């Protein structure tokens, strides 16, 4: 998300020194990627060891939740396998809230690999009333994400604006469910301000995140 907002900011009337600072932050993140990858793999290995020693479906379900968090945006095929394991465990436990949570994981993967139709079908099959507070926030964010990506790859300007409008409808809902001042809150607020063409405000908020 940081990269997306950064790229949007480069076309705005921003002082060169501010752009340089943001680019240095991005460059540092890229250079440190091998270190982050090694650390993440170590965390994944530790979770897999815990899974082999787990004794209950509840424990396994919780561990798979953590494992999904490590695989998302890292290995999408593994993330999908983990999400499906969560669905199977949730069904075995006959826990509808757990089932919906795991299905949202699958939707996230579908959206992440550009299978937007499949992701939307999963989202459309879930009712927000069947989710807890964190699940609703996650649910709204996946709708926002899929429409944002569909706008990015839309063939015509008309369709681009249509999908951007759909994504925008979810921004306020997401902001209202995030802790004021948190990074997630500030990043979503900056995206909203960019959409509203309040560029200076958006950049000031973005700078405060890093």
Name each model-derived stretch.
Residues 2-210:
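A "functional boundary" signal
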């Amino acid at each position: 998300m940081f990269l997306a907002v950064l790229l949007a900011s480069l076309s705005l009337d921003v002082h060169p020194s501010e752009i340089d600072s943001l680019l240095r932050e991005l460059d540092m993140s890229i250079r440190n990627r091998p270190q982050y990858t090694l650390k993440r793999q170590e965390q994944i290995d530790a979770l897999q060891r815990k899974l082999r020693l787990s004794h209950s479906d509840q424990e396994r379900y919780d561990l798979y939740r953590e494992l999904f968090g490590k695989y998302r945006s890292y290995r999408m095929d593994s993330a999908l396998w983990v999400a499906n394991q969560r669905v199977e465990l949730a069904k075995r436990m006959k826990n509808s809230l757990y089932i919906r949570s795991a299905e949202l994981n699958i939707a996230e993967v579908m959206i992440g690999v550009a299978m937007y139709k499949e992701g939307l079908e999963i989202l459309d099959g879930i009712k927000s009333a069947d989710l807890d507070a964190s699940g609703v926030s996650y649910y709204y964010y996946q709708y926002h994400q899929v429409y944002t990506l569909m706008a990015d790859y839309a063939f015509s300007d008309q369709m681009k604006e249509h999908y951007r409008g759909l994504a925008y409808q979810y921004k306020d809902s997401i902001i209202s469910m995030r802790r004021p001042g948190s990074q997630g809150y500030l990043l979503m607020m900056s995206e909203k301000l960019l959409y509203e063409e309040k560029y200076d405000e958006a950049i000031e908020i973005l700078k405060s995140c890093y």
